[in-house]
């Protein structure tokens, strides 16, 4: 399958360079990943803290502390506790549908600003919570903020970056997610030691810090030339394109942006257009890539890491420290992707990371099966625990340089402008839907499948690696405005792409 995405036509190379202005703008915009990552990391740690459990989820606390014969696999199985974690993702799913319209009508910048502000309110509510209802309302507001940010930020990064650097700059978003996870794990480790049992308030309330960074940063950001053009601001778009490319010679790129913008204006309903045959490759990728990303099992490892480590026999402090270790691995492994994605391409990282995750999951399942069996009762030695953590780190590192960043990068770069906001909304909806679904059923699956849960996720990774090998073309170095070419040259997708796209461009030319 070496020619799965290759073609003979060379991509365009627009004049311009990587400017300091673009790098800073992308770095600030990527702070949207901090709020998502912080929440992923903070939730699992807080739900493993005894004062938090005894106050809000006493039945779980009783199973953990008082019922000595509870199966290790099942002691955290609680619907209210699961709802606390997963309600954010359901809210993000719904919010992303509205965020699509806001992104298209008001621009990427305003969507990020709104997301940061709403997340800030949710953080304050969670930190001050006195009952479960207040916790859930706060989580819903956090989810709305996350939905807005992950709708707008990947689009913003893809549109600001020059084609040859798009992979690296877009992956900064995933890097910020990993930084958020790491800091959340570190904060949980130290707040768990606070005397008086109120450390969980600090953990939840400090989510306001990344929210403030994103809110203030969004105020200072420029909007993208693509977004300005789609809203009829031609002069501003031309000026911004000159600034971000660092050259006066923007004619070819600007002309292509105008053509894409006119094609957008010819589309009355981008949602209906997305369902047309010529956009079948983009629709399939916008559904399957985020879905398969969640079926790696990564989020259950990251936001349930302390709970998971407690389940397999680690003590409370040890489980939080193990989560810090996986957070460090997650962050540093993301740098591998930043350094290699524009050199080796997307497919190589997808396939290599997939194979590594498959190996790690099946070995983890075997290790836990040997030690715990189905009874879920065993004392784990320090040496055995270290081996388990090592293979979890092997899994996390593979995800961090493959499906983690590429699950956001590839969908954000393959959509033509006329369907970009709608298609990105589909990406967010399916990502959040399956994040919600997996979060909602994970503790139940752990209780029912036991060590078999790792084999389940390993099987999913086998399927997704095969999917990439056969159906995903290489997108490295292709300008967004030319991305249709790779589908037209693909052995399978070429049957869907061709004349339809030409008709859209002809419609655009008649409107000029």
Swiss-Prot record:
Residues 39-81, 138-139, 188-201, 316-320, 369-385, 447-450 are extracellular. GO terms for cellular component: membrane. Residues 1-17, 103-116, 161-166, 223-294, 342-347, 407-425, 472-512 are cytoplasmic. The chain crosses the membrane at residues 18-38, 82-102, 117-137, 140-160, 167-187, 202-222, 295-315, 321-341, 348-368, 386-406, 426-446, 451-471. The keyword Transmembrane applies. Keywords: Membrane, Sugar transport, Symport, Transmembrane, Transmembrane helix, Transport. It is a multi-pass membrane protein. The keyword Transmembrane helix applies. Induction: Induced by cold and abscisic acid (ABA). Its main location: membrane. Disulfide bonds: none annotated. It holds the Pfam family Sugar_tr. Coiled coil: none annotated. GO terms for molecular function: monosaccharide transmembrane transporter activity; symporter activity. It is found in: Membrane. Mediates active uptake of hexoses by sugar:proton symport. Belongs to the major facilitator superfamily. Sugar transporter (TC 2.A.1.1) family. PANTHER family: SOLUTE CARRIER FAMILY 2, FACILITATED GLUCOSE TRANSPORTER (PTHR23500), SUGAR TRANSPORT PROTEIN MST8 (PTHR23500:SF10). This is Sugar transport protein MST7. The gene is MST7.
């Amino acid at each position: 399958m070496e020619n799965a995405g290759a073609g003979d036509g060379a991509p365009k190379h627009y004049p311009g360079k990587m400017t300091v202005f673009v790098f800073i703008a992308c770095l600030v915009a990527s702070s949207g990943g901090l709020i998502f990552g912080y929440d992923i990391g903070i939730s699992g740690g807080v739900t493993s803290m005894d004062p938090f459990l005894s106050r809000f989820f006493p039945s779980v606390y009783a199973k953990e502390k008082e019922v000595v014969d509870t199966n290790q696999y099942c002691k955290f199985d609680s619907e209210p506790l699961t709802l606390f974690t997963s309600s954010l993702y359901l809210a993000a799913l719904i919010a992303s549908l509205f965020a699509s319209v806001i992104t298209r009508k008001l621009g990427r910048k305003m969507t990020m600003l709104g997301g940061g502000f709403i997340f800030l309110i949710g953080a304050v509510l969670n930190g001050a919570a006195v009952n479960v209802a207040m916790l859930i309302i706060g989580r819903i507001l956090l989810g709305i903020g996350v939905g807005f940010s992950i709708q707008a930020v990947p689009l913003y990064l893809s549109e600001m970056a020059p084609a040859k650097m798009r992979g690296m700059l877009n992956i900064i978003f995933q890097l910020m997610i990993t930084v958020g996870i790491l800091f959340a794990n570190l904060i949980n480790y130290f707040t768990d030691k606070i005397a008086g049992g109120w450390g969980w308030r600090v953990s939840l309330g400090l989510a306001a810090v990344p929210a403030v960074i994103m809110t203030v940063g969004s105020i200072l950001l420029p909007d993208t030339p693509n977004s300005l053009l789609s809203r009829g601001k031609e002069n501003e778009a031309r000026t911004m394109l000159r600034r971000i490319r660092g050259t006066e010679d923007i004619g070819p790129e600007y002309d292509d942006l105008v053509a894409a913008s006119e094609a957008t204006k010819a589309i009355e309903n981008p949602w209906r257009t997305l369902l047309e045959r010529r956009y079948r490759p983009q629709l399939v990728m916008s559904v399957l890539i985020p879905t398969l990303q969640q079926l790696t099992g990564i989020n259950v490892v990251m936001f349930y890491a302390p709970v998971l480590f407690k389940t397999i026999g680690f003590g409370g402090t040890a489980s939080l420290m193990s989560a810090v270790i996986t957070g460090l691995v997650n962050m540093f492994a993301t740098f591998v992707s930043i350094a290699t994605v524009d050199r080796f391409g997307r497919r190589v990282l997808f396939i290599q990371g997939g194979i590594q995750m498959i190996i790690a999951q099946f070995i983890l399942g075997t290790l836990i099966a040997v030690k715990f069996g189905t009874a879920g009762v065993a004392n784990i030695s320090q040496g055995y625990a270290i081996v388990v953590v090592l293979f979890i780190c092997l899994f996390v590192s593979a995800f961090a340089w493959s499906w983690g960043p590429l699950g956001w990068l590839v969908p954000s770069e393959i959509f033509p402008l006329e369907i970009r906001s709608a298609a990105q909304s589909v990406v967010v909806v399916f990502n959040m839907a399956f994040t919600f679904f997996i979060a909602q059923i994970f503790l139940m699956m752990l209780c029912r499948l036991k060590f078999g849960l790792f084999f389940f996720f390993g099987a999913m990774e086998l399927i997704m690696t095969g999917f990439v090998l056969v159906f995903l073309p290489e997108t490295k170095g292709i300008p967004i405005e030319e991305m249709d070419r790779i589908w037209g040259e693909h052995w399978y997708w070429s049957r869907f792409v061709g004349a339809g796209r030409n008709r859209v461009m002809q419609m655009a030319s008649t409107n000029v």
